[in-house]
């Protein structure tokens, strides 16, 4: 087994004494920093490499802190107007994961970079911490490499805003396996529409 395999096993056993201590100390460290800052290197090099990171020019890691919990509807003094069924303010659940929110914030902050992927690095009772892998699409090392040329195309601008990253696709219900059967046909809406449309085929 290589070194990354051992690191992967360490991260799998998060309840071990070593990992509990490490995660607790790191969470304290991350809380002292700003909610979005550049990391000098990935905290989990094995995970980052599996998601496409390379230790070369053009790759950047940003660490993002996201507040945990449900979403409160931003309305003044709870005045929502309309019918009582839509009066909810406090117990609102956001449709996307906190990981996709972290990707979006990093993408907004670094508008010229492209979000490749992200991964979890820690959490406490109040916050979750994610590291986001970003790529500079104008760097020669990225543009000349056939493996990374795809992300330099204009169609991949702000892919994190449109649910095209791994975390975004999961929130949209897109994927393989029995967990994603509600989106056969492209999206949740397309699948629902097909199932609820009565088709009376003509007898010939």
UniProtKB/Swiss-Prot annotation:
Q: Does the keyword Cytoplasm apply?
A: yes
Q: Which biological processes are named by the entry's GO terms?
A: cytoplasmic translation
Annotated GO CC locations: cytosolic large ribosomal subunit
Q: Does the keyword Cytoplasm apply?
A: yes
GO MF annotations, alphabetized:
RNA binding; structural constituent of ribosome
| Cellular localization per UniProt | Cytoplasm
Q: Which UniProt keywords apply?
A: Cytoplasm, Ribonucleoprotein, Ribosomal protein
Q: Which domain of life is it from?
A: Eukaryota
User: Which purpose does this protein serve, as stated in its record?
Assistant: Component of the large ribosomal subunit. The ribosome is a large ribonucleoprotein complex responsible for the synthesis of proteins in the cell.
Similarity field: Belongs to the eukaryotic ribosomal protein eL15 family.
The cross-references to NCBIfam families, in alphabetical order and at most eight, read: PRK04243.1 (NF003269)
Query: Record's PANTHER family?
Result: LARGE RIBOSOMAL SUBUNIT PROTEIN EL15, RIBOSOMAL PROTEIN L15
Q: Can you state the subunit structure given in the record? A: Component of the large ribosomal subunit.
This chain's protein is named Large ribosomal subunit protein eL15
Q: Which organism is it from?
A: Monopterus albus (Swamp eel)
């Amino acid at each position: 087994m290589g070194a990354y395999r051992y690191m992967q096993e360490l991260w799998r056993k998060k309840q071990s004494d070593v990992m509990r201590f490490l995660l607790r100390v790191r969470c304290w460290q991350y809380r002292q920093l700003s909610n979005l800052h550049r990391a000098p290197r990935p905290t989990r090099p094995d995970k980052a490499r599996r998601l496409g990171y390379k230790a070369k020019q053009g790759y950047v890691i940003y660490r993002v802190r996201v507040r945990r919990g449900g979403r409160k509807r931003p309305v003044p003094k709870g005045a929502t107007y309309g019918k009582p069924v839509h009066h909810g303010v406090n117990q609102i659940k956001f449709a996307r994961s906190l990981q996709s929110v972290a990707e979006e914030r990093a993408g907004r902050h670094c508008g010229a970079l492209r979000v490749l992927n992200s991964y979890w690095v820690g959490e406490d009772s109040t916050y979750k911490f994610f590291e986001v892998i970003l790529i500079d699409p104008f760097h020669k090392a990225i543009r000349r490499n056939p493996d990374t040329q795809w992300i330099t195309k204009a169609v991949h601008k702000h892919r994190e805003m449109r649910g095209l990253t791994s975390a975004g696709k999961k929130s949209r219900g897109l994927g393989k396996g029995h967990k994603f059967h509600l989106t056969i046909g492209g999206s949740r809406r397309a699948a629902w529409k097909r199932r609820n449309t009565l088709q009376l085929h003509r007898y010939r």
